[in-house]
Amino acid sequence: MQPPPRKVKPAQEVKLRFLEQLSILQTRQQREADLLEDIRSYSKQRAAIEREYGQALQKLAGPFLKREGQRSGEADSRTVFGAWRCLLDATVAGGQTRLQASDRYRDLAGGTGRSAKEQVLRKGTESLQQAQAEVLQSVRELSRSRKLYGQRQRVWALAQEKAADVQARLNRSDHGIFHSRTSLQKLSTKLSAQSAQYSQQLRAARNEYLLNLVATNAHLAHYYQEELPALLKVLVSELSEYLRDPLTLLGHTELEAAEMILEHARHGGKATSQVNWEQDVKLFLQGPGVFSPTPPQQFQPAGADQVCGLEWGAGGMAGESGLEKEVQRWTSRAARDYKIQHHGHRVLQRLEQRRQQAPGREAPGVEQRLQEVRENIRRAQVSQVKGAARLALLQEAGLDVQRWLKPAMTQAQDEVEQERRLSEARLSQRDLSPTAEDAELSDFDECEEAGELFEEPAPPALATRPLPCPAHVVFGYQAGREDELTITEGEWLEVIEEGDADEWVKARNQHGEAGFVPERYLNFPDLSLPESCHGIDNPSGGEPTAFLARALYSYTGQSEEELSFPEGALIRLLPRAQDGVDDGFWRGEFGGHVGVFPSLLVEELLGPPGPPELSDPEQMLPSPSPPSFSPPAPTCALDGSTAPALPSDKVLDCPGPLDMMVPRLRPMRPPPPPPAKAPDPGHPDPLT
């Protein structure tokens, strides 16, 4: 059976796509800057040689035509590149009539530079990187929630399987020699309670995953439909202003200077006047496919879970998932975003008026304030889009969203109207109160200082394990690559770092050999039990007891009773008598040999709660073999009309802001094959 195709982490895919977008955009901006520099260089040379006649002028235009032919630009006359080529052709045709335009070309050469273009590019790139970082953060939150959901589903499925196995044995009265029917009934009741608890945890994790999924879809749609075109509009429209004036001047100069090439000059001027950012952006987006929206992402059920929608608790009321609280929270957020946008637009109008009337020394401060208000409005729009997607999904799940949404929006509209009247009253008394305008503009600052703008709910903490940590091999595995490690059932490993792909970790065996092993073939004692079960296995309530030790130094036994081991070896500690005296020597097992060794030469590793000598052998039942490998479960669509999203995956490696440098691609590893047999009864799973 062939393994499933390799998967790429969603954040890495999004990050690479964003890097491609920035690279293409910067390449385009560089081409436009080169074009601007070409116009400037062309004008300077044209002013210097304008007094020469036809042949000299044709020699001047020839290199530019050749250079334009080598440039991979657009031939459409509605773009700046097409208009530039038309003007070059007109220059060749009217070379002998350019004497009188020398002064005008000299002025054009001095007024056209690339510093303004570089400033526009820097500002637009910063805005684009910030928007991309927010999208990437949403994808990271989606990956974390999906990983938690997958963990909860695996724990629930394992509990269901064990409960069914015990119940089947109870029905067959197959309690064996070491168990009685009463002990099997108690164990069945315990496993049923655990299964119900894990089912509730699975429902909460699934609901959180679904909410983050639709929010990420909405955020991605908003980015591709609103933010990206707006940023391109700023970049291209300002560039069009810088290019349109010199190109128009060139065209008018041609018309005024030459009667012989009047038709050519008019054609160049018409082509220049047709240049606009909308058509330029449209043609630019039709070229590369990087800026096209990603396809909608579908919900991917984990394992045997086939529930594809939000789920209420038992009894018809919202249970621990808190769906009604989610409705109340996001309706309040929608009302707040509505107020922020309306207030922000009113503040923008006041700032625009102040910028027109402000003296030169105050203009930079007003411009900075304008950028801050626009950024707050944009963030409110993003929050509104994500909240609307969540509310739509909650309404599809059967919750009465309008019950909370209508009162919240009505109250928000009333507050907006009240603020508008108060603002008009302040402005009408400007002569009597000079600070009325400042009070109007400070309302937005008060909202920002409150610290409640755009607060996203913190995602639930995932179960993490400190590295390095011990692990018990449940199934053997034969290495298939040079960087993988062969493991045998029953041995102990030390996990030293996360793997380079999903379902793989890097571990070191007792002989100091390190390599990648399948994560599902290992049992991590320190994470196998929930907190609610600790009190059952460790009634004394003491600190966890170490059952594994790492050798800090190599040691050679001085007698047959002593144990020899190399540096870095993992030694399994054997139980000691509870009332024994610690003489500085411990008893352990390494490499199939049992013996004593000095305790000062090793470092204890914490194991599961409760010492080994307190384990109840009657509670140890053989675990059934895990399910065989199956292809990925079919996906189900949440909403056909929702925005696109990216495939979910495990939690990402980089929680920080978006790094715009090219990342180091890590090799992808296919999922491990299914285990060959069931675990050893001597090493039962902690759930039983």
Curated annotation (Swiss-Prot):
Residues 623-634, 668-678 have a biased composition (Pro residues). Residues 607-688 are annotated as: Disordered. The modification Phosphoserine is found at S442. Residues 466-527, 544-607 form the SH3 domain. Signal peptide: none annotated. Its main location: cytoplasm. The keyword Phosphoprotein applies. GO terms for biological process: apoptotic process; gene expression; import into nucleus; inflammatory response; membrane organization; positive regulation of actin filament polymerization; response to hydrogen peroxide; response to peptide. InterPro entries: AH/BAR_dom_sf, F_BAR, FCH_dom, FCHSD_SH3_1, SH3-like_dom_sf, SH3_domain. Detected in inner ear vestibula and in the cuticular plate of cochlear hair cells (at protein level). Ubiquitous. Detected in testis, liver, brain cortex, cerebellum, spiral ganglion and tongue, and at lower levels in the organ of Corti and utricle in the inner ear. SMART domains: FCH, SH3. Keywords: Cell projection, Coiled coil, Cytoplasm, Cytoplasmic vesicle, Lipid-binding, Phosphoprotein, Repeat, SH3 domain. One of its GO terms (molecular function) is lipid binding. It is found in: Cytoplasm; Perikaryon; Cell projection; Cytoplasmic vesicle. It comes from the Eukaryota. GO terms for cellular component: cell projection; cytoplasmic vesicle; cytosol; perikaryon; protein-containing complex. Residues 12-280 form the F-BAR domain. Residues 360-386 form a coiled coil. Homodimer. Interacts (via F-BAR domain) with SNX9 (via SH3 domain). Interacts (via F-BAR domain) with SNX18 and SNX33. Interacts (via SH3 domain 1) with WASL. Interacts (via SH3 domain 2) with ITSN1. The F-BAR domain has an atypical, flat shape and binds preferentially to flat membranes. Upon heterologous expression, the isolated F-BAR domain is localized at the cell membrane, and causes the formation of cellular protrusions. Promotes actin polymerization mediated by SNX9 and WASL. This is F-BAR and double SH3 domains protein 1. It comes from Mus musculus. The lineage of its organism: Eukaryota, Metazoa, Chordata, Craniata, Vertebrata. The gene is Fchsd1.
